[in-house]
Design a protein with these regions (language model features):
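Multi-pass alpha-helical transporter architecture, strongest
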Residues: 200-205, 398-424
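Helix-to-loop junctions at the C-terminal end of transmembrane segments
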Residues: 69-80, 283-295
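Glycine-rich segments within core transmembrane alpha-helices of 12-TM secondary carriers
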Residues: 149-173, 196, 363-375
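Extracellular/periplasmic helix-loop-helix junction of adjacent transmembrane segments
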Residues: 34-67
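C-terminal ends and interior cores of transmembrane alpha-helices
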Residues: 90-109, 304-319
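C-terminal transmembrane helical hairpin of 12-TM major facilitator-type secondary transporters
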Residues: 297-342
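Extracytoplasmic gate region of multi-pass secondary transporters
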Residues: 31, 229-279, 372-376
Length: 430
């Protein structure tokens, strides 16, 4: 018979993971339908210019992530994790639904891309606090010796949400004529996001608040920037490799496979979906292993693999054969899966409990907003400028070098004392 503590822990996991799934489904589908959105909202004759414009709006959504991280991190440290998570999923659901209703440039003129940009900024504000708040939420409530696994579940929730978006995109691309998909079919996944958001909102709205028993700060962002800025910079450096590698591998490559290799949209999305599915077992396995062998060895291994393998993997990807394209992306998946699954636990463990949401959100989102959000745009621009389809690999190599140095500055935390909420520990003791 399950104990009351075990049931509560399971509900906490569901709230953290499932809400994250819903949030990242909403945010990911924009990247997957970037080509269609570019044609609807930007009146350029050149398809490359349309794609650059669509990814430019994508980047703006990311550039506001630090602001969203500061806002939602403040809510999490001041009023509790539940309030932060509920706010983020509600904002995402509403903005996603409205994107699905927006008229295109042919109907609304300049107002169409302006409105799209504003809604993407709302999404960026929401995502700025969502992932990091769920990381904190899950790791704080981990049973003893399971913080790595619980942090990996946060990453798995993200992966499953993006997988869901990719699968939905692949399904519509497979069954709809290209003209219908361009005209209106791309809107359906955005409209469906409202239903997913409502489910996530009520799931989080009803979960028990079990924040750590520490003094709530009135201005956590001020304390974070004044007293813990070194930690924020370290967390940002840690996130560089994840930001660049993830968004090259799973956002930019969907369009790259179509433009560089001539692979159809349906096949490009199928490749992405199959690759994303592998992240789930990899994440769980790596999370368990880091609780036994530590965080840093896996992080260092992933950055070294990214530096050495980026160019060869892009060379493999740059073939029209579907099997080779799939194998190339699977290589990136293994690297991202290892790194992304370890990252949540070490970030949360490194941050002081009284400003944990704010510190993790700022460190992670400064990097994801400035670097990750610009990565698809930078990759597309470099390819257009140089004519070299392999050049995005050098972005991954540079990011790997930066994060390798940042990792060395962190102490090993998997056996260090940790101030969490105690829900997971309580479940283990009951």
């Amino acid at each position: 018979m399950e104990t009351r503590g075990a049931v509560q822990t399971r509900r906490l996991i569901a709230a953290g993971v499932i809400g994250n799934v819903l949030e990242w489904y909403d945010f990911a589908i924009y990247g997957y339908f970037a080509a269609q959105i570019g044609r609807q909202f930007f009146p350029h004759a050149d398809p490359v210019a349309q794609l650059l414009s669509a990814f430019g709006v994508f980047a703006l959504g990311y550039l506001v992530r630090p602001v969203g991280g500061a806002l939602i991190g403040h809510i999490g440290d001041r009023w509790g994790r539940r309030a932060a998570l509920t706010f983020s999923v509600a904002a995402m659901a509403i903005s996603t639904f409205l994107i699905g209703l927006l008229p295109g440039y042919a109907t609304a003129g300049l107002a169409a891309p302006v409105a799209l940009t504003l809604l993407r900024m709302v999404q960026g504000l929401s995502v700025g606090g969502e992932y990091t708040s769920s990381m904190v939420f899950l790791v704080e409530h981990a049973p003893p010796g399971r913080r790595g696994l619980m942090g990996a579940l946060a990453h798995c929730g993200t992966s499953f949400g993006i997988l869901l978006g990719s699968a939905v995109g692949a399904g519509f691309a497979a069954v709809m004529p290209a003209a219908a998909l361009d005209a209106w079919g791309w809107r359906i996944p955005f409209l469906l996001g409202l239903l997913l958001g409502i489910a996530g909102y009520f799931l989080r709205r009803n979960v028990l608040e079990t924040a750590p028993a520490v003094e709530r700060r009135r201005a956590p962002i001020v304390e974070t920037l004044h007293d813990h800025w070194r930690i924020v910079l370290g967390l940002a450096g840690l996130a560089v490799f994840y930001a660049v590698n993830f968004y090259v591998s799973f956002i930019y490559l969907v369009s790259w496979l179509q433009t560089a290799d001539g692979i159809s949209p349906a096949h490009a999305l199928e490749i992405n979906s199959l690759s994303m599915a592998l992240l789930l077992p990899v994440g769980i396995a790596v999370g368990l292993l880091t609780d036994r062998f530590g965080r840093k060895p896996f992080l260092l291994l992933a950055t070294l693999a990214g530096f050495v393998c980026a160019v060869p993997l892009f060379w493999v990807l740059h073939h029209s054969a579907l099997l080779l394209a799939q194998l190339g992306q699977l290589g990136f998946v293994l690297i991202v899966g290892i790194y992304g699954s370890v990252q949540p636990a070490i970030m949360v463990e490194a941050a002081p409990p009284q400003v944990r949401c704010t510190a993790v959100a700022l460190g992670f989102n400064i990097c994801l907003g400035v670097i990750g959000g610009l990565t698809p745009l930078a990759a597309a621009w470099l390819v257009a400028r140089t004519g070299d389809e392999i050049v995005p690999a050098f972005l991954i190599m540079g990011a790997a070098a930066v994060s390798f140095v940042a990792i060395l500055s962190f102490r090993e935390t998997y056996r260090a004392p940790f101030s969490g909420a105690g829900a997971g520990a309580a479940a283990a003791r009951t």
